[in-house]
Amino acid sequence: MTTPAQDAPLVLPAVAFRPVRLFIINIVLTGLAMLAAGLSGHLMVGVFFGIGLLLGLLNALLVRCSVESITAQGHPLKRSMALNSASRLAIITVFGLIIAYAFPLAGLGVVFGLALFQVLLVLSTMLPVWRKFRFGEADGGVLKGSEGEEQQR
């Protein structure tokens, strides 16, 4: 007998989630967005863009915490992870939309920041996995040579 998908145990691959790196990227992108928006006369769009990026990072950190707590259970279920994710995303989305509504033009920067952060998150977790598949190493740069020495790629 098979287990229904919603009751199946949660199995997560080991992925490289580096929140400090993402935070630094967020700060750099916020600075660039503020510079570009300031030059075009809409500095607050850049500020709200940075807020959106930081909300995305907060969401990613909350994902990590919830995954750790759910997988620490004796028999983690996908259903609890899905409900946790849906409620967290709903709260962050509503918060972003409230900001966008409260600040009619500049507040849309929050929505764009949230969207761009999701792209950054996917790329930052996909690239290490892709390197592992391509090069056969977790760190993606050090390979074993034919004589047993390490060669830097």
From Swiss-Prot:
Compartments, record wording: Cell membrane
Keywords from the named record: Cell membrane, Membrane, Transmembrane, Transmembrane helix
Keyword Cell membrane (UniProt): yes
Membrane-topology annotation of the record: Multi-pass membrane protein
GO cellular component terms listed in the entry, alphabetical order: plasma membrane
InterPro entries: ATP_synth_I
The keyword Transit peptide appears for this protein: no
Name of this protein: Uncharacterized protein ML1138
Source organism of this protein record: Mycobacterium leprae (strain TN)
Lineage: Bacteria, Bacillati, Actinomycetota, Actinomycetes, Mycobacteriales
